[in-house]
Amino acid sequence: MPSPDTPVPSPSAPASGPASASRRYIAETRAFFASRAATWDTRFGDDMPAYAAAVARAGIRRGGVAIDVGCGTGRALPALRSAVGRDGAVIAADLTPEMLAQARPQAAAARAALVLADARRLPFADGSADAFFAAGLVNHLPDPQAGLAELARVTRPDGLLILFHPSGRAALAARHGRTLTQDEPLSAGPLRRSTAATGWRLAAYDDAVDHFFALAVRC
């Protein structure tokens, strides 16, 4: 769950095929976040209200199963528990063990299960989730469209996908010293096409100065 001011590693070129590229992606991602996990909330812990607002805006149904994929330190978990209510289920999944360790207090308070998992190959049954919350995740996957397809596999018809970042795309690009382009995965056109190609309907797209929010509905 990247912060507004922290660049994440770009997927590296494969050393010798897809399997090697996948292992390298996992190793680099874990190394990056493991080294920052202990101080993450100290540096970026003031944006929980923005996470809560994004969850509330999505309209997750009560009693459902909500999964925070790429959960980081668990900043969305209290809001997800509030959304699904006492009879719902909340799952926090992340690729980095150290991030899951930092998420334990939030997970305990939200009665959320912690799962070590790769967002590209989730250990959940087809159609078992009512909603996914993904903060700063999809555009950093080696293949964002394949990532959307995997999330679609796990989501029931009419289920929700919330893509979020507590900073708008232009502001985030400026902080990282790069120029924003319209062919990036989270640009409106590419995201609309990739969601449509993977079983989603893009229902809302809001790229503001102080947040990015997109809502897709499973077809």
Model region roles, listed by residue range:
Residues 183-198:
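Short alpha-helix
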Residues 145-157:
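A short glycine-rich, Lys/Arg-flanked "PGG" loop and its adjoining helix->strand segment in the class I
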Residues 67-121:
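Class I SAM-dependent methyltransferase SAM/SAH-binding core
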Residues 2-62, 75-79, 102, 162-185, ...:
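Conserved class I S-adenosyl-L-methionine
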Residues 120-131:
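A short acidic, Gly/Pro-enriched loop at the edge of an enzyme's catalytic core
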Residues 85, 141-142, 155-156:
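Helix-to-beta-strand junctions that scaffold the AdoMet/dcAdoMet cofactor pocket
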Residues 131-143:
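A short SAM/SAH-binding and catalytic strip from SAM-dependent methyltransferases
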